[in-house]
A protein has these predicted regions:
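Conserved active-site-proximal phosphate/metal-binding subdomains
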Residues: 56-79, 85-144
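Active-site entrance/lid segments in N-terminal catalytic domains of soluble metabolic enzymes
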Residues: 1-74
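Conserved acidic functional residues
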Residues: 25, 82-83
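Glycine-rich Rossmann-fold phosphate-binding loop(s) that bind the pyrophosphate
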Residues: 4, 81-82
Length: 144
């Protein structure tokens, strides 16, 4: 999985040589096309609702844009990311053209997670409007 630009050609070649799919996070349809042209196997289409570094386009808008933009790349899978927690949200993403979803924050609340109990409680009690985007950690916007 690559999060910073197009993976180097040698990495893509190694993945293919060993049967390991290569994925990349994308926040715009233009980035998705560049990744597909480079030979990436899986596009993690990360909307503004996604945790961590995310783009400016919402998941609901971005997924169908990317699905249409890369439709000619038959071997590229699309995973929707950003604000997906329930089966209904997963079904909606798939109805918009995703082949599946990439979830993140929801796993912090599982029994298996090493997240502290206090943080788990806060995550589960939080409302959907209680996340923020900030540059405080890396200088680039990140959902926290």
């Amino acid at each position: 999985m690559n999060a910073l630009g197009v993976p180097p050609a040698y990495m893509l070649a190694l993945g293919k040589q060993h049967g390991v799919p290569v994925g990349a996070l994308v926040g715009t349809k233009q980035h998705a096309v560049k990744q597909a042209e480079a030979g990436v196997d899986i596009l993690i289409v990360s909307g503004t609702e996604a945790g961590g570094h995310c783009g400016e386009v919402s998941t609901m808008v971005l997924v169908p844009e990317v699905a249409e933009a890369v439709a000619s790349f038959k071997d590229v899978s699309i995973l929707a990311a950003g604000g997906i927690v329930t089966g209904r949200q997963m079904a909606a993403a798939m109805a918009m053209g995703a082949h599946g979803v990439w979830t993140g924050s929801v796993w912090l609340t599982t029994i298996e997670s090493e997240t502290s109990p206090i943080i788990k409680e806060k995550l589960l009690a939080a409302a959907s409007n209680q996340t923020v985007r900030s540059k405080s950690r890396t200088g680039k916007y990140s959902r926290q």
